[in-house]
Every structure is written in C-alpha cells, then in structure tokens.
C-alpha cells in the first residue's frame, strides 16, 4: 500500500517471478485416491506443495538470479496446531475462476441437455484410451497422468453437475423466478419499455442456436486439444494463413518469422506418445463425424471421408500415419528445406485442421443460427443486470460472479448428510488412509516408509485423540481456481488448504446449495506431519510461525 500526494490510498501489486519449488509429497500422499476419490468424501489426500519466493537483496521483485535471496515478508500466516472441530469458524481466501449464478433458465437447460452430456461422453472415451496405454507403459503413465486427471476432473464435474441440476430441479427454480421477474418488469412502465420482451428474446435465441451449440461442443471435444499432432497441424495452418496475408507463397526455413514453425516438433517431444495420440485422434474424429452434419465438415474432410469408404476411424489413422505432424523426426526432416504453401497444405493433418475451422462453428451456417447466437449474447448480459436488480428488490444479498479475482468465503467446519440415511463426519483420519491401501491399485498405493511411520503411530505434536487427522469439510463456497487456497480460523491462523468440492454440490456454478455444498480441505497438521516425519525436513518448520 502506498500513499499518494493527495492523501488517498492506492494499492500497488508487486509480481515476484522467481518462485522455486521446495518440495512436494509423492502421488501416494498428494494424490491418494486419484480420480476414484475425486469430488468424493471421505478423502485422504495430502494435497500440497512448498514453494519459496525469491527477491533481490532489497526484497524487491527480480528475474531469476543466483544472487537472489528468499523473500522475508513483514507478515505471514501463522500455522494453527489445535485442529478443527464441528462448528469452528472457517474462511477461505483465494481466486475462484468463474461462476454463472445469474444465468437464465434457458442457459441452465442448455448446459444440462446439450453441453454436459457431450463433454462426459467424449472425455470418458479419451480417458479409456489413456488408461489403456498408461497401464501398458509406465513412461506413458508419467507423460499423460496430468492429462488424464484433467479429463477425469472435468468429466466427473459435468456428470455430477447434471445429477445435481436434476436433483434440485434448478431449471424449474429459475423458471419460477423468471415468472416473478417478468411481473416485476411489467409493474413499472420504464422497466417494461426497456426489458418487457427480454425473456421472450432469450427463448427465441436459445431455440435458434440449439443445433449450432450442439455442433460447437462436438467441435471443441474433437479438434481443440485431444491430439497433439492435430495441434501441431493447426499451428502450421495458422502460419500458412499469415504467409497468405503477406502474399507469400513459400515458407523459407531460415527466415526469422518461420523459426517457431520450423521448431514446432518440440511439442511432439514432451509428454507425447504416437500410438496414444493416434488412438485419441481416431476416436474423436469418429465421434465428430457421427454427430455433426456433413455440411459442417468442410470440403477436405468430406473428400477424405469418402475416399476411406465412410470409415472415419480408418481415415483418421491413415491421415495420422502419412502426416509429418505426427512424428518429430519426420517433422524436422520435412522442414529442413523450403516448402511451398500449396505443398504443405497437402499434408493430410494440415488438410483436416483447415477443413474444420472454429469460424464455421462459432458463426453458424445460416442466418437464423447467427442471429440466435448474437441475440443470446446480448440478452444474457442484460438479463444478469436485470436479475441482479430484481433480487436486490426482494431483499436478497447480491454478489458478483467469480472471475479469478480475490474473494473471501466464510463458513464453518460441518459434517455432511448427502442423502437419506447417509451421514459423513467432518473429518477423515490416517486410519481411513490405510483402509483404502491396495498395492494392486496405483491410486491406492502406500510406500514402505509411510506404512512404517503409520505403524509406529508417532504423530508428534500434529496428532489428536491418538490419531492423525487428514482432511476435513467446511461449508465454504468455492469453485475451480480455489485449489490450494488457505483456510483460516477466526483468528486468521492457517488451519488447512482447500483442494476439492463434493459431488452433491456440483451445481454450484449456477446454483449454490448451502446445506449440501462442502469444501474439502487438507488439515494443516497433516501437512506438517508429512514435512516433519515423512520427509524428515524439520528445518523447513523453522521458517514457519506457529500460533500459540
């Protein structure tokens, strides 16, 4: 905080870019339970990592240098050692990514009926392929584990979001609110003149774009990310477009502009397995051609599909095998000399990516779809403003949607009753961790050192009631982007780290359920025990401050 000349105050944010990894637990601690336990309870994850921020000798931000020193901030969070219990105050400070709690009933219905089913089906297909290859080869497991978790995380989210939207009948709740909203609009002549047809316009817009939205989601799932080779081809295609705009008909390999494209095989040298990528491409192309109208494919894809006798799987595999974009050695050899734009465009993977373009799917193929998409964009924005004012008029406390800016959510440690006859305690223990131990399941493996330490039951000052608490639940309101956010008690002391939500609250993007929403946190005492006892890194604790 710096004081200006006129006496007011202005916030100044410094960005420290020299941030170094100090340590992180193995997957058998940090990711214990894997995607099986994801969004579930009880969990037993030691999900944390330690970083140290470096600065110049005056404590100012600086680029990486061997001369930099650890930053010594004036204030740091103190670590609480007393543990948590039901009803204890808890607040989370972090950077939640996005919510859409002013979405119309039409938007919620579209998500529930169009987007989420497509996401779940396609990502489970990709997960099946990854799992098969990961089980075949430990190297592939290492290279694709992050990708697999990302797919699992979002697929599970979409699946449970739909279950929650149906369970709580969120569309019907929004429709009932919109009936009251319409009456409120019509009760005032100025409001009626400006927004009297707002809901009608939304209904028309969503109906007009229904098919386009379905096609767009299949496009996203098939062409934006599953195949690294296809991403390489897309990068090449983008550069060809640049050459055309410059009225150049050849790629000169030693030109400054072309160097990034010539070096593009680097993407195929990191976390890439050709056999895996080939299967991913084929599966997504099959899904795309089976569900998207032929007129949306583009001429090249249509021709390649027909040449393969209508066999999309065979077509995709043949394109992959013949392309320089799928093999780093082939790529480097191809761009070892100058190439004409026309010649490069004959590569089958480049032809695929140029045939199926994002503009075709975001713009729509007819005027009705284009008008529908434009109408929805304008009307949803206005709808959010009007709904905000309407809810405020009903005395409801309002707050803006999450947008990756810092937010604070407050609540308390709470158990969970997710359904009839089912009760979950608010805390999980090390006993549950060992109950799940299974040496034959990668996600539930426990290494020898961890098993020996647990058998000794030496919890030090981190234990309570002759056990070690691992995770706990709060009723805080978080979303994607909050992972790693500090969880504080009423004195501002660190009691844990938020890392997950629960399945029963997955409608939280559009509708928050206060009785069922839970934040899953790692108990800070478990973090300290792992550092102290498992890692035998007690010197790191000397750098921390502990609440008395």
Residue ranges with predicted function:
Residues 66-76, 408, 475-478:
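Short, structured beta-strand/loop micro-motifs enriched in basic residues and often containing a Trp
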Residues 78-88, 477-498:
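Catalytic nucleophile loop of clan PA
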Residues 109-341:
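Cationic-aromatic interfacial patches
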Residues 34, 70-85, 425:
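Active-site substrate-binding loop(s) of clan PA
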């Amino acid at each position: 905080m710096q004081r200006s000349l006129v006496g007011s105050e202005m916030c100044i944010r410094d960005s420290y870019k020299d941030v170094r990894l100090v340590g992180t637990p193995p997957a058998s601690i940090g990711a214990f339970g894997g995607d099986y336990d994801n969004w579930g309870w009880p969990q037993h994850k030691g999900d944390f990592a330690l970083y140290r921020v470096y600065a110049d000798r005056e404590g100012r931000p600086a680029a990486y240098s061997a001369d930099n020193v650890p930053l010594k901030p004036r204030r740091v969070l103190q670590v609480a050692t007393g543990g948590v219990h039901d009803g204890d105050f808890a607040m989370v400070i972090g950077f939640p990514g996005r919510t859409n709690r002013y979405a119309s009933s039409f938007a919620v219905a579209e998500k529930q009926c169009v987007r989420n089913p497509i996401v779940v089906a396609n990502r489970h297909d990709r997960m099946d392929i990854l799992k098969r290859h990961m089980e075949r080869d430990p190297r592939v497991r290492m290279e694709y584990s992050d990708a697999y978790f990302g797919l699992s995380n979002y697929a599970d989210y979409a699946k449970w979001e739909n279950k929650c939207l149906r369970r709580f009948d969120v569309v019907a709740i929004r429709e009932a609110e919109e009936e009251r909203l319409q009456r409120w609009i019509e009760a005032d002549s100025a409001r009626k003149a400006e927004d009297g047809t707002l809901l009608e316009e939304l209904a028309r817009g969503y109906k007009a774009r229904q098919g386009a939205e379905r096609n767009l989601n299949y496009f996203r799932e098939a062409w934006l990310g599953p195949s690294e080779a296809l991403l390489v081809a897309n990068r090449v295609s983008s550069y060809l477009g640049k050459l055309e705009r410059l009225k150049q008909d050849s790629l000169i390999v030693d030109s400054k502009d072309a160097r990034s494209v010539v070096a593009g095989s680097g993407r195929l040298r990191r976390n890439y397995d050709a056999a895996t990528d080939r299967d991913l491409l084929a599966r997504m192309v099959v899904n795309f051609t089976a569900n998207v109208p032929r007129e949306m494919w583009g001429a090249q894809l249509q021709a390649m599909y027909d040449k393969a006798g209508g066999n999309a799987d065979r077509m995709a595999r043949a394109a992959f095998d013949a392309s320089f974009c799928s093999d780093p050695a082939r790529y480097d050899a191809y761009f070892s000399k100058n190439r004409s734009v026309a010649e490069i465009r004959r590569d089958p993977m480049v032809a695929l990516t140029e045939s199926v373009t994002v503009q075709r799917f975001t713009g729509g193929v007819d005027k009705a779809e284009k008008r529908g998409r434009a109408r929805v964009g304008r009307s949803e924005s206005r709808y959010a403003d009007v709904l905000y004012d309407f809810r405020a008029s009903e005395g409801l406390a309002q707050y803006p949607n999450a947008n990756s800016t810092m937010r604070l959510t407050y609540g308390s440690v709470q158990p969970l009753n997710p359904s009839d006859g089912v009760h979950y305690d608010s805390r999980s223990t090390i006993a549950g961790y060992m109950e799940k131990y299974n040496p034959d399941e990668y996600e539930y493996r426990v290494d020898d050192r961890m098993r020996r330490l647990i058998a000794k039951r030496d919890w030090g000052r981190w234990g309570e009631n002759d056990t070690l608490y691992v995770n706990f639940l709060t009723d805080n309101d978080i979303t994607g982007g909050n992972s790693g956010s500090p969880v504080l008690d009423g004195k501002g002391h660190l009691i844990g780290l938020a890392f997950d939500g629960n399945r029963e609250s997955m409608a939280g993007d559009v509708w928050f359920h206060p009785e069922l929403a839970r934040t899953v946190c790692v108990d800070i005492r478990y973090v300290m025990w792992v550092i102290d006892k498992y890692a035998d890194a007690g010197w790191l604790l000397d750098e921390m401050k502990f609440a008395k």
